Amino acid sequence: MGQGPPIIKKAFVSPGAPPEGGLPEYREKGQREMELKNFDNIVDLIPKLERPLRVILAGSDGENMVRGIFQAQEAGFVQPVLVGDRARTIALLERLGLAQKPYTMVDVAPGHNVTQEAIDIVRSGDGDILMRGNTSTRHFLMPVLDPSNGLRTNRLMTHVSLVSLPEYPKLLALSDMTVIIKPTLEEKKAIIRNTADALKAFGYENPRLALLSLVEEVTFHMQDTVEAQRLVSEQSRRPFADCELWGPIAYDLIISKEAARLKNYDCPYSGGGFDGIIAPDLSTANILVKSWLIHAHAVTCGAVVGARVPIALTSRSAAAEETELSLAFCAILDAWRKKQDKA
């Protein structure tokens, strides 16, 4: 692998690639808010960059993902590195009218693992953000989570979504809908820490996180309610994350102030005060967010937190705009992580 961008083994640079040293100027750091009402100004929250962030797209023949990465390039904060079948990728770019845009192409022969190729680029230092493209979640995550591939840190990798719901007054974080299938108590702590850190990257000082359960009462017949109580108790005595925890709490009490009133549930954050939801397991989180997308016309973005670099991970059926939002999310996480490393 080469030592600096965009020199990458087996790379094909598009005709529109910028000359060395000819990268555009990047926006000044936007004003951070304590609460994000929606996604409207998320790109403006990206701190000023010395250069565009090199996004390594694993599987470069997915239409909306390719659209999204080039929209992010147009917004001025990424440099696309497309990893996949060159012929299919270029045919797609020509069909989308993007063939003359600046990008770097890494050709991967059919049958070879595009995710492994993408990870190798990141490991070499030639990538800032890893992105899942047109490959299944399973085939993407297996090499990502493989310790021998060097993406692991001392933190557990978990997925954090940001969701804009029409009836909720601000963006809502949700975790984990992708990585940890049935989290243990210790894994739930890691999910909570990563979710809190993701919100802190946006300027939240003490995120309010709800521990979702079917019911708000603790019952030994439902292990997640017992674990929620233990997590809240431990957080109050020996904090393990920079956040405020509340739970166990049912979904209606998180979302609706009226539901809390009717149930005589005394919670100051019901109906719009919570910043994030921690689901009891992956299935619950995944079903919840897909229900929001289909029935509530929600808008989402998502990233894997806790890896060596931020990882943009959205559904392959997600709109191009959601891909761009996920890359903005990753850019903000990357800036925050680097700031923490220097502290």
Predicted regions and their residues:
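Anion-binding alpha/beta catalytic cores of soluble intermediary-metabolism enzymes, centered on
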Residues: G30-S270, D275-A343
